[in-house]
Amino acid sequence: MSRPLRIIPLGGMGEIGKNLTVVEFGGKIVVIDCGLAFPRDEMLGIDLVLPDISYLRSRQDDILGILLTHGHEDHFGALPFVLRDVNVPVYGSRLTLAFAKSKLDEHGLLKCVDINEVSESSRFRLGPFDVGFVAVSHSVPDSLAIVLRTPLGTLVHSGDYKFDHTPIDGRITDVNSLARLGDEGVLVLLADSTNADVEGSSGSESQVGHAFHQIFAEAEGRVIMASFASNIHRIQQAIHIAHLHGRVFAVSGRSMVKNVNISRNLGYLDVPEGAMIRLTEIDDYPPERLLILTTGSQGEPLSALSRMAYDDHPQVALEPGDTVVISAKPVPGNEVSVMNTVNRLLKGGARVIYGPETGVHVSGHAAREDQRMLLNLVKPRFFLPAHGEYRHQYLQADLARQAGMPDDHVIILENGDVLSITPDKAEVTDKVRAGMVYVDGLELGSAEHVVVRDRQRLAENGILIAVVTISVQTGELLAEPEIEARGFLYDDDFRTQVLQEARDELVERLQELASEHITGQRLLQEDVSEVLGRFIHKRTRRQPLVLPVIVEV
């Protein structure tokens, strides 16, 4: 019986972000991508979300390397956290590694990591894997699909891709290489599902330039343009077209400044002589000659654009006559934040251009016709829709079945599923631990951690603090309990009444405990929490977090 090829996603299935896929053959492992996700609104105080890599820790001696598809943080952003535990070689294209190295340097890890540059022409062996790459178009330059040839068959991972026939840098998705792989025979394809609910084909990045020309021609004041800092092609178009219209540009936002400098130094960004000025110099130029490139297209509260909108930016004060262009689509979950920013910008007197009908954004992901084309080119025996919410995976799985693939050859995986593939069969044979790890300041914690639950409870129901002073010898109450409430009980009179009733209820229970000679700190804390929690719920239908403080004298 032949050894199976095993595919184990630890992130990126049924969700947007934290993409990380384990590929295993003959007891050896390569990892494709190592991404993070950004916290949802209910993840209070959380900075970042990482995939749980418990499985990789348990197999770290078998891991041969991490292969990166491209330079977006949902595909490489977890590297500084993962490499602390599993320090293995990292492979990626030139720009992808430049972004990754900058992130590693921030964490003091750059000198500790074995980093290897590859391109679409690279081919090498990692244990039982013959590793190759295919050039693909995406919203960040230098993106790659990954090809793993094994004795059992070939795996192709699309990464994020689309078929752009007129890309800004002239680097198209290599359909000839994909077709050759299809002719050779592909055992399994993992493909980007993000736009499986979008009919037709994704538009070319160059289309955005037409809208930019019109905006710069019509704008009488400054143009402030927000986009993803990694969308170097978008930034290139903005710089080039602004220059044609007689405008210089400045850059605002830490990640935008960093990525512009990296891309310029590596030759991915062409800046005309004299076109770039410092942000501190913008007052030296008339408004009609200025473009300001900024972060904040997702309405992030601390981003440069949000600070402009709320009149909190140290260099850029919003002025009537400004034209603000939001050249990005809100990531699911960010819609409210983006609209709040738009509202503030409009109140500040700016003209705001955003939304699909304006032509200022095209997606970097394959739509349904593109996905159908990839399936027809690669002709996989087994197909795994990846990188998307369940609805995206479902729709792309349905697309594969429409293309003639048998039902049992199209598999929708969940994070942690262990898919075992032989030449004739693919089935989930096991499950490993996979979930979310939260980055909270300098700490890492699991999604189930009590800290996060406490924050959610505080936000939803408030807190009740009870200070009880008792005799250490007898357990008798030495003073009336002090009870304070925050985050509920809005009416002052009702609040006073409820808290007094709560004190009376608590005193009665504490007297019972004293008569029974129960004086242990933990037992008293549990009783105080139970009595107050039950009483407050009965009187208010709220369940605040009860924090008992026992003072023994």
Each model region followed by its residue ranges:
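Hard-cation-handling environments
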Residues: 197-327, 331-356, 360-517, 525, ...
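Short glycine-rich phosphate-binding loop at a beta-alpha junction
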Residues: 89, 384, 547
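C-terminal tails and terminal domains of large nucleic-acid-associated
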Residues: 517-553
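Conserved hydrophobic residues forming the short capping helix/wall of the S-adenosyl-L-methionine
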Residues: 104, 400, 536
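His/Asp/Glu-rich metal-coordinating catalytic cores
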Residues: 1-67, 72-285, 303-317, 336-340
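A glycine- and charged-residue-rich anion-binding loop/surface
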Residues: 13, 37-41, 62-63, 354-357, ...
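Short Gly/Ser/Thr- and Asp/Glu-enriched loop/turn motifs at secondary-structure junctions
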Residues: 119, 414, 542-546
